Amino acid sequence: MIEPFILFGEQHIETLTYTFGIIVLICLISNFISTSLQNIVTKIIGISLLGFEILRPFLYIFVFEKPWETYLPLHMCAFSAFLIGIFLLSKSRNQMFFELPYYWGVGGATMALATPDLTLGWPDVEYFFFFYGHGQILLGVFFALTVLKYRPHLQNFWRMAVITILLLIPVSYTHLRAHETPI
């Protein structure tokens, strides 16, 4: 039987420890391998990010019979995963494809991992998908920071802020229109 998820319970703390440990280990080891091996690891992380984000909604909807409205990849963490995955797979890397996941993903994925909205613990598939998906975002961003040596540029912060606001306006409007507000 699958136990209920307990926020900051033993299972949650262990999963966080493993997640962050794997991220640190991959980033550290990748700094001591050849450039050709770094390129292979970069591609593997990028393919894993994109593959997981593309397959996840289909798995939830068609295999686990979850409601499609809930599992469409229309949130900032999914956008972050797509962007950092594309960034890692591109030959000419677009700085904004690094910076948007840096600002959205690090804060969002860290907060999501620290305070997940889960009802069941391991070995529930949603538990695995949640920690794997958000952990990958952090891995992609920290790999770009520590191994590929990319850094966010302060002059691009305002562009990132405008893109964020433009993405949030329709989402907020749609959310407000979808729910009846009390008079």
Question: Model-found features: residue ranges?
Answer:
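Conserved small/polar residues in nucleotide/adenosyl-binding loops
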Residues: 174-183
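Membrane-embedded alpha-helical segments of multi-pass membrane proteins
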Residues: 17-21, 73-83, 101, 131-139
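Membrane-interface helix caps and helix-loop-helix hairpins in membrane proteins
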Residues: 61-68, 92-94, 116-128
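Aromatic-anchored segments of alpha-helical transmembrane domains
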Residues: 49-58, 105-116, 165-173
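Membrane-interface helix-boundary motifs at transmembrane edges
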Residues: 32-42, 90-97, 148-157
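A glycine-rich, hydrophobic loop/mini-helix early in the fold
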Residues: 43-88
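Alpha-helical transmembrane segments in multipass membrane proteins, preferentially the mid-helix core
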Residues: 84, 137-153
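Hydrophobic transmembrane alpha-helical segments in integral membrane proteins
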Residues: 1-22
